[in-house]
From Swiss-Prot:
NCBIfam families xref list: guanyl_kin
Protein name as annotated: Guanylate kinase
Annotated EC: 2.7.4.8
Keywords: ATP-binding, Cytoplasm, Kinase, Nucleotide-binding, Transferase
Localization, UniProt: Cytoplasm
Cross-referenced Pfam families: Guanylate_kin
Family, per entry: Belongs to the guanylate kinase family.
Domain annotation Guanylate kinase-like: ranges: 4-181
Residues that, per the record, bind ATP: G11, P12, S13, G14, T15, G16, K17, G18
Main location: cytoplasm
Catalytic activity: GMP + ATP = GDP + ADP
Single Gene Ontology MF annotation: guanylate kinase activity
Biological function: Essential for recycling GMP and indirectly, cGMP.
Length: 208
């Protein structure tokens, strides 16, 4: 069985990567990896669906037990991707989406180079500011921290395979779907199945 694709989507806070991922999942048979975090839940977030919310002590115990594919500390809180389920789904041939921060994505890229790494960009920095402000969940101090981090994080776009500007969610989703479709046709991903098919054809011609 062919392994599934690991699709890693990240970008600065406010680029709308969460919304993009929701739309991708709505129209495709992807498996979405739910991250663990020590931050407090936001309004409407559900334990086990939005995140696995846990204490700092619980998270650090899981780090010691090597339970994470990647983890990072962002704005004072831990975020991490539980490892075992991701590996299980990939081995079953399921395409897996990780929506993770930039630190975490670069960790995954070190250990899983065959993944597809997609960086979500805002249409402009002004629009990025507006999106973060509209959330209404940040203090003035934390807003400034997020703005400064976003400016720095955009410099990491060159570490990714693809960059997608999220101006309109529908357009961004279509671009990502096109990227995934193209990746599935890459010869280095499908050469084994091509060779098996070729051997089958030769066998038929020789013995039938």
């Amino acid at each position: 069985m062919e392994k599934g694709l690991l699709i890693v989507i990240s970008g600065p806070s406010g680029t709308g990567k969460g919304t993009v991922c929701k739309e991708l999942l709505r129209n495709n048979n992807f498996w979405f990896s739910v991250s663990s975090t020590t931050r407090d839940p936001r309004e409407g977030e559900i334990q086990g669906k939005s995140y696995y919310f846990m204490s700092k002590e619980e998270f650090e115990d899981k780090i010691k037990e090597n339970d994470f594919l990647e983890y990072a500390k962002v704005y004072g809180n831990y975020y991490g991707t539980p490892k075992s389920k991701v590996i299980e789904m990939l081995d079953k041939g399921k395409d897996v989406i990780l929506e993770i921060d930039i630190q975490g994505a670069l960790q995954v890229k070190e250990n899983y180079k065959e993944g597809i790494f997609i960086f979500i960009l805002p249409p402009s920095m002004e629009e990025l500011k507006n999106r973060i402000i509209k959330r209404g969940t940040e203090t003035e101090e934390s807003l400034m921290t997020r703005f400064k981090s976003a400016y720095k994080e955009i410099n990491y776009v060159s570490k990714y395979n693809y960059a997608v500007v999220n101006d309109k969610v529908h357009d961004a989703v279509e671009k990502i779907q096109s990227i995934i479709s193209a990746e599935k046709c890459r010869v280095d991903r499908i050469k084994d199945s091509i060779l098996l098919s070729k051997e089958g054809i030769i066998h038929e011609q020789l013995y039938d």
